[in-house]
């Protein structure tokens, strides 16, 4: 064996069992039994042995609001690794007038040889011409089997219902999954412009201009369109009770509907946008955070298996230099917040609080993402033959989240001051230790592009 991990407690979505495991050639080669000599033995006494986290919603090196986000693939993926995530699926954005394959080539140039962990792409379809819709048929051959469209941001990302129907229909026939940002963009634009005309320009009006009904209306419409063409659909960052109700109604009708939520919607509320000294701008992301009641709805949905995953929606806009552009007009605040490093630690607090079980935690942050997005069982579990993407987790370790302890390129954490119990200590990527007792020891060439299998209904 190359590495033996001894005395740990293996936790998968299916169960919990104390067992030693052996790693050979980047794969889990043996669980339990007697082991021969190894190049290295790691003592995992008192620690859980989790599969590496999988974050299927990140925006790295994204360009919006006439600027580029702070994190590069190098910094974002080191942060992810230190938080216990060993694979991300990033949003690769098509440029208008260009093909989807050109977008892939652009992202390859940004990520190739510069990623500390494994990575894949969803493609954001911004310019859905006839030729682009036809491209959906060939992208699965490149290992890209998911696409994202927006029902918001007219003039930037927003597509109409006919285009959404065509995209859903074509993707379903080619084994791909369409991910939808569900907000009624026209309603949101109308409300935000009305607020500004009335002199209401503070960050809180970002949330007030995108109320739950704006999200729920688009969610209901997207689900209905998927139903019309009998296509699977994945609603990204579901935030509120009204949208959840629409999801449940669609499921009851037999719609093949999946949905995620994100860490920020479990812990932050719209009240955070009213923090003094323009601090509320840090919490301007879309959809906006909601209420404590909505948080309870989301936690219950996670516990009951209705929501598929918890992602980060990591998008690294600095407070100074990005967010502060909107001091006089909330519409100029770049939408998004960091979170790829904090995700596992924050979701794990749900275990401590009795909201979800230990196995459900693994299901939400690793196993289900791998299954939905075509990476299981190579990733997302601890099993013989799987990639040795492993996190040794100390359930008793405590910390207070501070940006100074994070590994990204940011100047704040969305979860600054949160008290945490349970942290990743050692992280392995395909059998290589990349985080050793909290210290990053990997290299920017460790990560590999991950081809994903077609989606199966």
Swiss-Prot record:
Homotetramer. Catalyzes the stereospecific hydrolysis of the cyclic amide bond of D-hydantoin derivatives. The gene is hyuA. Gene3D superfamilies: Metal-dependent hydrolases (3.20.20.140), Urease, subunit C, domain 1 (2.30.40.10). Its cofactor is Zn(2+). Pfam families: Amidohydro_1, Urease_alpha. GO terms for cellular component: cytosol. The modification Phosphoserine is found at residue 69. It comes from Rhizobium radiobacter. Belongs to the metallo-dependent hydrolases superfamily. Hydantoinase/dihydropyrimidinase family. It comes from the Bacteria. Zn(2+) 2 binds at residues 148, 181, 237. Keywords: Hydrolase, Metal-binding, Phosphoprotein, Zinc. This is D-hydantoinase. One of its GO terms (molecular function) is hydrolase activity, acting on carbon-nitrogen (but not peptide) bonds, in cyclic amides. CDD domains: D-HYD. Zn(2+) 1 binds at residues 57, 59, 148, 313. Carboxylation allows a single lysine to coordinate two zinc ions. The modification N6-carboxylysine is found at residue 148. Binds 2 Zn(2+) ions per subunit. Substrate binds at residues 153, 286, 335. Its EC number is 3.5.2.-. InterPro entries: Amidohydro-rel, Hydantoinase/dihydroPyrase, Metal-dep_hydrolase_composite, Metal_Hydrolase, Metallo-dep_Hydrolases_sf, Urease_alpha_N_dom.
